[in-house]
Every structure is written in C-alpha cells, then in structure tokens.
Amino acid sequence: MADLNSPIQYLKDDFKDQTSIGSLEYDENSDTMIPSFAAGLENYEPIPSPTTSSSLYSHLTHNMEKIAEEDDINFLHDTREFTSLVPDEADNKPEDDEESGGAKPKKKKHLFPKLSSHKSK
C-alpha cells in the first residue's frame, strides 16, 4: 500500500524549457492526486477540442503564416557577400590578349593535370 503522507515526485517542464521537480500531493477530499503547481487553476479555460472548434485551426494557421513571413524576412538579407564571389565578365578576360594582340590563344590549365595526361588516342 502506498504511503499517502509522502508526495510523489516527478519531472515537469517549465514555461522556460527548464525541467524541475514537481510533486503530487494527496487531497483527502478528492479521489485524484493534484499537482502542487496546479493551485489557482480552477478558473483556467482549456483549449477547445479541434474537432469541435474551427477557431483553433484558424489560430494555428495564422501562427504558421506569421512564422513563414518571419522566415522570408530573415532570408531577405544583403546578398553582396555572395555576389562578390562571382567575378565580373571583365575579370574573365586574359591580360595577355592586349599585349600579344590576341594572335595566339593561351592553353587552358587543367584542374587535374594527372588525369588530363591520360587522353584517349
């Protein structure tokens, strides 16, 4: 038989995403165990059932849309840091063309010189 004088302890999640220890205390006038942190919640209105209320669905939909808008704002940042990595077209022209008159095109360097030496004959 359980000792009704000692509270039952359990872990509960606080509103700040912290875990703390709560306790269940025995109430002699009730058939159920009441959490010690539940005092004063007699006037609390529970969230309506989603099957009986469409307002909950519309509230959740509104929240999802608001989150999506915030995400869009977060991605509309300054993109100059990315575009600066792409060289301008003027930078792609070899400098030797002006000096040599463009008569002889330069040979392209391979990224993998060992692989380029194995050309099919």
Curated annotation (Swiss-Prot):
Biased composition (Basic residues): 104-121
Region annotation Disordered: where it falls in the sequence: 84-121
Localisation: Virion
Domain of life of the native organism: Viruses
GO molecular function: DNA binding
One GO CC annotation: virion component
Modification(s) after translation: Acetylated.
Keyword S-adenosyl-L-methionine applies: no
Modified residues (N-acetylalanine): 2
Keyword DNA-binding included in the entry's annotation: yes
UniProtKB keywords: Acetylation, DNA-binding, Host-virus interaction, Inhibition of host innate immune response by virus, Inhibition of host IRF3 by virus, Inhibition of host RLR pathway by virus, Late protein, Viral immunoevasion, Virion
GO terms under biological process: symbiont-mediated suppression of host cytoplasmic pattern recognition receptor signaling pathway via inhibition of IRF3 activity
Assembly with partners or alone: Interacts with the major capsid protein. Interacts with host IRF3; this interaction interferes with the recruitment of IRF3 to TBK1.
Biological role: Structural protein required for transport of intracellular particles from the assembly sites to the plasma membrane. Binds to both ssDNA and dsDNA. Suppressed the activation of the cGAS/STING pathway by interfering with the recruitment of IRF3 to TBK1, which in turn suppresses IRF3 phosphorylation, decreasing interferon production.
The protein, known as: Protein p14.5
Organism: African swine fever virus (isolate Pig/Kenya/KEN-50/1950) (ASFV)
The organism's taxonomic lineage, starting at the top: Viruses, Varidnaviria, Bamfordvirae, Nucleocytoviricota, Pokkesviricetes
